[in-house]
């Protein structure tokens, strides 16, 4: 007999006239690998007189409690059986006791095809022995269908195909299921239950790619300036539309292009100059916008958590800490005639005050800001321009818990600066003699009032010590270009500086530097430290007043979105467009006459 699907595998049956092999005869199939399989007899046709006990009798050590029931199945349905002893080891058992993992694997080099696809399914009785933690008991038989054995238990047939039966064994055995088949169903159910979560995990691992979101344009970003031709087009299209109301945009564009070509070089230069001026303004506005964005990020990352304010000075008293207030003050040189203590100017490398701001994420881990401040004896205060120029209203910076938290966070961020970073050029003033009478343990409240407007090179500084505790330094600056400077007051015992800017002080011409120390000897330490940060916005810089675009008009333009605030009235708009259009017609008519001549 030849197996379908192959050309070199034959099954030789000895003994003429016998419908099946006896129990003592075996056969050997070549080219099946290194293993030898002892295969029990195979019945070639369905014989009602054949009992399962005759076939299973070859294995004396096996006992099937359901043998009588299987005999009934064989008699009624003519089930073809294949008994095969398979030794199971602990390696084929999963940790849960099911037939998983390496499983029952039979690697056959050649394809095997069931020759009776139309007959009832082939049933393999596999003896499960040497199983300590399995579901089946010792020496107990189970009925496994060939298709489920290959799909569920990993029966690898060396690349060959298996023709599955037309009907499943459940269809044949459903009327009277045997104990072994029900046990097999439980095995399959456990296998599916265990393998189901693995499939879910694989599906969850594949996440769809999120589409990239387009960055929204900031409405505060300055708009790019128009070109010279765009300005000309904007000025002339209204006049063309007035004369030809039904003209389409394409026709208007052609007319404007022709007018631009025939326009004189001087008139073109007018528009080009406008474009250049608009470009310069755009670049300035763009630079300010980008700087504002970067500094806004730095201010947003400052920690606004409210730690205890008195801990800055009360944690470990230091004999002589000094408070360095970094303000936007140009470098000052005290005049010899000014009634001030001996002073000297120390030149240090220029550094940006904004660099003192350190975001919360990059602070050194486990570093206490108060310990740094007290060990070095220096507390650096960020200028008010850094905070108020970022959109913080003055109402929030009044003496309130919010203002204290903002200023305190700025102080803590400033204290993280390494000692080698020094502020810009300092104006050091010697301590007045009466300041030494203050006790080291006293902690007056700090009031920080700074003015961000630019200052004149010469300014008036008034140092006053008032009662109750606070010390105040009043800086009255007239507005001009800023140059960073810090005022440092050295104190042997304890010196707390309150920098207050009098907002009501008007801008004044350059004045001498005056330091007027007024100290109250008896001061009691306050219960807590009040920190306030108040700042005013700088006045806008003066610029030449714009004029109306129409030639000959000296009036100032009015605010109008349609004409970009370039005309003083609608009459000027019409006159300007009419003059431009008439100039174009005149230039065109001259060109036509020249061509006719």
Curated annotation (Swiss-Prot):
SUPFAM superfamilies: HMG-box. GO terms for molecular function: DNA binding. The gene is tox4. Pfam families: HMG_box. It comes from Xenopus tropicalis. It comes from the Eukaryota. A motif (Nuclear localization signal) lies at residues 212-217. It is found in: Nucleus; Chromosome. One of its GO terms (cellular component) is nucleus. Keywords: Chromosome, DNA-binding, Nucleus, Phosphoprotein. This is TOX high mobility group box family member 4. Transcription factor that modulates cell fate reprogramming from the somatic state to the pluripotent and neuronal fate. Also acts as a regulatory component of protein phosphatase 1 (PP1) complexes. Component of the PNUTS-PP1 protein phosphatase complex, a PP1 complex that regulates RNA polymerase II transcription pause-release. PNUTS-PP1 also plays a role in the control of chromatin structure and cell cycle progression during the transition from mitosis into interphase. Residues 222-290 bind DNA. Its main location: nucleus.
